[in-house]
């Protein structure tokens, strides 16, 4: 019998094929005969959730714990030393008491408490000791089995007023749960992969939260210790919308309607959806907010690692150097085609676990070939025609929707305008990360009773961890706009990104994935080579990382890394202060730290500009004073627009050639306001 089998009685109740269970003393004896360690690990959740304020008292000739009585009343304490050598004379299973002398008894739970207080090893726990552990575990509702029980049996397990939702996903199967339990018990770094739609993001964190609820706080489950450190787990996500949507899903599936008093907390953009949190719950947080509170968590889950979100990569790099400060690191992605070898090399004790199983429903693939090569000027127009024609014979039913993946916001606007002309019987809705009421827009798309089909014309924003219940079709152009300092490139996506896009369907019904590109063009994207490197440097200094070798992804241009570090040092602001600024503000331009460092109204107004695009006259003046100059070398007029070619005159990217456009005529120089906007030089 494996250790996994010993933990099968603690599996999280998915209410599909795993249900809450209260075991009898007779069943305990049967399990004990199979393996003396069965139910011994119950000691840990009982210490944490039942015995934390327990003491022995004596009532009506029975030694018992105060928690077995009316807890609102005080009782005289009995010192443990007075009872340390007692042994049962006889056992009354029905009353759950041992007789220890002619007229004196002790409850099973009190006896377990008394004996376990003196143990150092899980192997010391006997059958007599486990009887009280079983009683306490039944009260806590921490056991489960495959014996079907009514949904209401899950009420109250986590103080939830309503039942757990019935979940069929493979991520909550017993096999998956036991494997994850084993890896967590061994304190491995765990990399979880599996098809999109099997519940990695929506369900697996509940298994990890449940493990932490039961056993979190102990590094070694073979040792019995009554002292522990209780900390929550965190599910770290790249975008606010993912935090919100997954948070609501967790809340409702765990039987809650309100965050207050639940085990679920949301943290994003300076907001916290919670006031009173359960200590062993789950925090859903944006990567940025996770990054500066790593020590607050027992287990850290980083999702969508294939995206190589800058802060996510930094979190992994920091934790690799400080792995002993947490219990476990869990990384999740639909696929690791581009990253497995590096993670194997980078993490000290990593284990890869793939959750087998297809998505819930089949996905049909259709290739619509573009007759022009991608480098042809005619490619884009042909692509638009192909999409428009395809929507005539391959479209969602009324009330359902499709997702059209495009590279950028400007492309979304252009394609929507084109497609509406020839598809007037469909609704086209643009989706991207800057839409302020994105959750409401997506909810409206999914509301019952919609009379027309709709197409969500989306940037890669919808690529990950958002389930659109009415989505039946994906139309993929296979491209993504990758920003780079003072510009950007449109690239073909990686295989990982393609897998994510395809996985937007097949979750709630059969799906169709239509792709308008040659899959031979897919290749990995090394995000760090397209990014400013300042944030990597600030975090590296804070957490004593050695650059570049301690980074998960090492930049190709190491000279730029050195130049960027020297540039930051020239600000004469301590790295501790820089870190504080970076974790509290967006800092889209590194030079903004000079304004944020002043604090007060100046910092407040700049933050308002970065978050809400509200620019005051004072903030405009402050940004101009940073002298972020661009020299205009050439000017070309196209219709009503002026197109400029210029070069950067500041920082490590000095002399970088950039292209700007505006309806206004500028001469000689302009000030950069943001990486993407500029104003008159005066």
UniProtKB/Swiss-Prot annotation:
Protein name per UniProt: RNA helicase NPH-II
Main subcellular location: virion
A molecular-function term among this protein's GO annotations: ATP hydrolysis activity
Keyword Nucleotide-binding: yes
Domain Helicase C-terminal stretches: 386-551
Protein encoded by which gene: NPH2
SUPFAM superfamilies reported for this sequence: P-loop containing nucleoside triphosphate hydrolases
Reactions mediated catalytically: ATP + H2O = ADP + phosphate + H(+)
